[in-house]
């Protein structure tokens, strides 16, 4: 959709997944460390928990992709599933629908990776990397013959898209790497906020319209992209620290409850021993 809503919709999807990954990835790293300290039964419970989370995530990805395709195709000015009718019909909407299609395929790969043992390890990351590559490939040929600022602001998005595709592809070969996972989180959030920025620049909700040919605006937008990256890094850092400190607090509380229980049992044992000694003295 060539309007603000058309950019806010994918921006919201990427923001939600980026924020979710920023919480899930450090949480998963902490639980992985605990796996080495627990028995087989607890390890099986953690594996089942991870699989359930991944299954829900894949299902949500499929749902969001379906919503995106329906929104692109069946808005009032959309193509309504007509590709050619005396000429090409709304090719921009078709390109966006194709982008959502590959994210839906990525969601299917997520579900299959969890529900079937015959699926190769890393297939979920491979298809996510492919979906990101297709998005960047489509957007690269999406911006020709446009005003300079329009081309520039979309080309900046490609850094986040292709960067995310490359880092996710590396996860196929270096599974459960903390740095690569956090990089994926950062670039997903950057994509989400930058989609909103594109919408505000090209389709401002209020105030004067941007001059799409002025070089100063191009310079500002380039600097603004760096600010978005800094904010994305800050958000991921806050989420990581929040999960880490919450885990530490829960561990301290659990340890305190165990110590209190031990003290109670010790005091109960000592009081019962005293009672037995008193009874024996009386006898």
Curated annotation (Swiss-Prot):
Residues 264-275 have a biased composition (Polar residues). Pfam families: DUF716. Its main location: membrane. Residues 261-283 are annotated as: Disordered. The keyword Ligase does not apply. The chain crosses the membrane at residues 7-27, 55-75, 99-119, 121-141, 153-173, 187-207, 218-238. One of its GO terms (cellular component) is membrane. It is a multi-pass membrane protein. Keywords: Membrane, Transmembrane, Transmembrane helix. It is found in: Membrane. Belongs to the TMEM45 family. This is Transmembrane protein 45B. It comes from Danio rerio (Zebrafish). The gene is tmem45b.
């Amino acid at each position: 959709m060539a309007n603000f809503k058309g950019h806010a919709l994918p921006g919201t999807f990427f923001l939600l997944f980026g924020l979710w990954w920023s919480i899930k990835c450090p949480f998963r790293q902490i639980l992985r460390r605990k796996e080495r300290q627990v028995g087989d039964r607890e390890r099986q419970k953690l594996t089942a928990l991870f699989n359930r989370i991944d299954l829900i995530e894949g299902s949500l990805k499929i749902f969001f992709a379906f919503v995106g395709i329906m929104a692109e195709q069946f808005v009032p000015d959309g193509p309504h599933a007509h590709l050619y009718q005396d000429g090409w019909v709304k090719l921009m909407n078709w390109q966006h629908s194709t982008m959502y299609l590959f994210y839906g395929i990525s969601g299917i790969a997520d579900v299959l990776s969890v529900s079937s043992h015959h699926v190769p390890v890393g297939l979920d990351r491979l298809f996510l990397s492919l979906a990101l590559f297709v998005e960047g490939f489509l957007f690269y040929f999406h911006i020709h013959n446009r005003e300079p600022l329009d081309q520039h602001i979309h080309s900046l998005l490609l850094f986040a898209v292709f960067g995310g595709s490359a880092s996710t592809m590396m996860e196929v070969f270096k599974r459960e790497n903390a740095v690569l996972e956090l990089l994926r989180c950062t670039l997903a959030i950057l994509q989400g906020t930058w989609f909103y920025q594109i919408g505000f620049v090209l389709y401002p909700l209020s105030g004067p319209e941007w001059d799409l040919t002025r070089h100063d605006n191009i310079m500002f937008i380039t600097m603004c992209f760096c600010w978005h990256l800094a904010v994305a890094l800050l958000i991921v850092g806050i989420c990581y620290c929040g999960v880490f400190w919450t885990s530490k607090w829960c561990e301290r509380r659990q340890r305190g409850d165990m110590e209190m229980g031990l003290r109670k049992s010790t005091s109960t044992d000592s009081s019962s021993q005293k009672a037995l000694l008193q009874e024996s003295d009386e006898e």
